[in-house]
Amino acid sequence: MHDKPDESVGRLIEEFLTARATRKPSPHTLAAYRRDLTTIAALVSEDETTPLPLDQLPITALSPRVMRTAFARFAAPRAAASVHRAWSTWNSFFTFLVAEGVVPGNPMPAVGRPRTPLPQPKPLRGEDTPEELLAAVARDDGRQRDPWPERDLAVLSLALCAGLRLSELLALRVASLAGRPGERRVDVAGKGGRPRTVPIESGVDRVLADYLDSRRRRFGARSVRPDSPLLVDRRGEPLRRGGLQYLVESCYRRAGIGDRVPRGARLHALRHTFATRLAEDGASAAEIMRLLGHASLASSQTYIEVTAGQQRAAVRSNRTNRALAVLVGGRGDDS
């Protein structure tokens, strides 16, 4: 319980972020929380008669009217998805403050919340593109200064055959690979602190074993202790976000498939390909939700709907259907 009714917004933001950190979100997520909170708070401060720094702006200044005005200014140059995310962050912030006894109520229901469509899947384009990518990366490329195809193939396999996010790949440890032969799995520290287990088949298991063997040869047995990061760079250091993104980009270039990777979904295209193929092979939305670690069934359902749409488009493009449409002159079914 807080005793001072006019505690500063800046201090309370720090308290909220500290509380959120106990849920083990990714550094990227925590940075997004901070950015959403401080950006809106700065807009509120600018509208004060005498603008105040955030460590002097009282929380009581954040009335529903003030928050509506700040969000209207924030929304003007931004996409609906960005505004939606910021609204959710501020709603969580005020929910925390109510629980802590800092404020009597949450003003966010009075602030318009934009409705955003669920993002559509962006898998690799082309029926055989995933197989072409894996085959190209598995080959030793003489153009590379220090090729490590075993490591590169391990990264692609975990994304394409287990559907892991970038942050989940970076969080893996050697001990994350577990299970008896025939029941192998990868234990994933999922988004939002939701752990999950993803089964891996013999092909992926073999790829990962080959990678760890190659790592022992490069850096010694101590480099693959159970608590060691699973994915490392060519110096044996833990892979970082930029390094992993660059690795995947270089794999696309080596395979010559850059034009088949959707814009804005470079590594995520591999995860989307995993989910899309699950849907094509008949997996339910609930199964996709569990395997991908989605927070809601709606996210998983988009893969089912897209696949159904693609199936209808394929049927529509069938030459026999087109010929029949010409034959009947496009008449509807009157029966």
What are these regions, as identified by a protein language model?
Residues M1-S335:
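Conserved catalytic core of the tyrosine transesterase superfamily
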